[in-house]
């Protein structure tokens, strides 16, 4: 049954490797609960997927697009870039002004430490215990 189904599908999808990818993807969709578009006739999911492709109840192009979307991890969104450089320039100036204002308001005073105080502090540190993890 499956061999005849594959031969029927080659007319719809010329590349057998692509056919395997599409049918496998559709079979996984059926396993996850997607509605089938033909009678099951006690066939397993891969055979049902091949029969759906052969009967053209599903478009191979739609399946291919769905497969691509299921494999994508990062989807780039095309946005207009014509107005973006002007906005970036003005927003970078605003950010610079905001940082300057914040720096004036939140001046943090650090304690000054002499070299002797620093050395005394370092001598007071306890070395970590050696273990055999390395």
Swiss-Prot record:
One Pfam family assigned to this protein is RNA_pol_Rpb6
The protein's matches in InterPro entries, at most eight in alphabetical order, are given as: DNA-dir_RNA_pol_omega, Pol_omega/Rpo6/RPB6, RPB6/omega-like_sf
Q: What class of enzyme is it?
A: transferase
| Cross-referenced SUPFAM superfamilies | RPB6/omega subunit-like
A biological process from GO = DNA-templated transcription
Highest taxon listed in the record's lineage: Bacteria
Give the family, as the similarity comment puts it.
Belongs to the RNA polymerase subunit omega family.
Q: How does it assemble?
A: The RNAP catalytic core consists of 2 alpha, 1 beta, 1 beta' and 1 omega subunit. When a sigma factor is associated with the core the holoenzyme is formed, which can initiate transcription.
Name under which the protein is recorded: DNA-directed RNA polymerase subunit omega
Which organism's genome codes for this protein? Answer: Brucella anthropi (strain ATCC 49188 / DSM 6882 / CCUG 24695 / JCM 21032 / LMG 3331 / NBRC 15819 / NCTC 12168 / Alc 37)
- Write the lineage as a comma-separated list: Bacteria, Pseudomonadati, Pseudomonadota, Alphaproteobacteria, Hyphomicrobiales
Gene responsible for this protein: rpoZ
